[in-house]
């Protein structure tokens, strides 16, 4: 499992912290110009604007996975995202291409909620004690080790953008799905496909307990008890209060939100879906968005002819995504020029082989 404390070997030199924003921007741009097409900088939508301005492409997890796989020209990928995204890029790209993460402490709390030891134990209990024929699926927000586990057992990765297609595929395999590590995306997707809540269970990896209310024989999906630390901060009460103030308000949320929030919202979908919905919204319409704050603020700045706010007025940005900043980006690019490999993310060959199977299966389904 990724351990940000063990992964960080050196503190950022003080000189980068002392540089002005203009100096950092000029330094970064100069290196981009120098390296040209040898450098590629995929950047997640949740990044802040100071980083997004240098992106060669912005996207959600599915878009970035596809783009990295298709790019055979770049020698260096500087991934402005979090650790599991850089791992995914390494798995999908050629061995001759290096993947850099500007700050090695940019992890993901959701991915850390399912380590491989827990997954193997949970699988054994579900298959041996409860006699369930399990097909595992994992959200791409997971470690390479979890993706390997899923690939070895014939399963697939999913993203919020293709979860419905992949879960539908899995349901048609005649097995019980084990959905890692985000219970909310799994529950919302399965329910949207017509699976009632009583045919869902939750596996608690800490208590080592299977929680269900219906008949065990009717189970269609077991949800890993994990969640996104950002999207869990949106609640149905936020929607209720907003509609009391403004009955005409439009509410759109990410499916990583709790089931009650998704059911109460007017719209729910992936990051790409949210962006496209806001882009095509009628002028003068009013929107509350339940997703990461950097993206909400960027949409608010971009589409000024509609009213946009966060569903939770006290919301903050994703803390680990925000670890990627101009000083770390400049430092990382200097390391590339110096031949320093400290920030390279490399997945071992055996893990990458089976993890790639789960990723390729996802891409073939969708």
From Swiss-Prot:
Primary location: cytoplasm
Binding of [4Fe-4S] cluster, residues: 108, 228, 318
Cited Pfam families: NadA
Protein name: Quinolinate synthase
Recorded metabolic or biological pathway in which this protein acts: Cofactor biosynthesis; NAD(+) biosynthesis; quinolinate from iminoaspartate: step 1/1
Entry annotated with the keyword Thylakoid: no
Binding-site positions, iminosuccinate: 44, 61, 139-141, 160, 254-256, 271
Function: Catalyzes the condensation of iminoaspartate with dihydroxyacetone phosphate to form quinolinate.
E.C. number(s) listed in UniProt: 2.5.1.72
């Amino acid at each position: 499992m990724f351990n940000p404390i063990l992964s960080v070997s050196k503190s950022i030199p003080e000189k980068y912290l002392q540089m002005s924003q203009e100096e950092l921007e000029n330094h970064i741009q100069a290196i981009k110009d120098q390296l040209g097409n040898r450098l590629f900088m995929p950047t997640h939508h949740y990044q802040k604007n100071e980083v997004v301005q240098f992106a060669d492409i912005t996207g959600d997890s599915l878009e970035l996975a596809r783009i990295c796989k298709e790019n055979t020209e770049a020698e260096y990928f500087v991934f402005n995202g979090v650790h599991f995204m850089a791992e995914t890029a390494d798995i999908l790209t050629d061995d001759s291409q290096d993947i850099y993460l500007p700050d090695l402490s940019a992890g993901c709390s959701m991915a850390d909620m399912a380590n491989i030891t827990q997954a193997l134990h949970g699988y054994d209990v579900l298959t041996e004690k409860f006699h369930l024929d399990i097909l595992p699926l994992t959200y791409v927000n997971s470690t390479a080790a979890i993706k390997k586990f899923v690939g070895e057992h014939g399963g697939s990765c999913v993203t919020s953008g293709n979860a419905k297609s992949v879960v539908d595929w899995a349901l048609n395999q005649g097995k019980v799905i084990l959905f890692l590590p985000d219970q909310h995306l799994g529950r919302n997707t399965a329910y949207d496909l017509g699976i009632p809540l009583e045919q869902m269970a939750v596996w608690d990896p800490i208590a080592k307990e299977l929680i269900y209310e219906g008949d065990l024989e009717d189970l269609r999906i077991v949800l890993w008890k994990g969640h996104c630390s950002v999207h869990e901060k949106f609640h149905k009460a936020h929607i209720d209060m907003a509609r009391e103030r403004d009955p005409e308000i439009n509410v759109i949320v990410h499916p990583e939100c709790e089931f009650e929030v998704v059911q109460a919202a007017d719209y729910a979908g992936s990051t790409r879906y949210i962006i496209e919905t806001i882009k095509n919204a009628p002028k003068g319409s009013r929107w509350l968005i339940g997703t990461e704050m950097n993206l909400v603020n960027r949409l608010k700045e971009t589409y000024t002819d509609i009213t946009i706010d966060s569903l939770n007025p006290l919301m903050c940005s994703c803390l680990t995504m925000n670890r990627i900043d101009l000083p770390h980006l400049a430092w990382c690019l200097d390391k590339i020029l110096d031949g320093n490999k400290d920030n390279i993310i490399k997945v071992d060959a055996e893990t990458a082989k089976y993890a790639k199977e789960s990723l390729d299966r996802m891409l073939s389904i969708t």
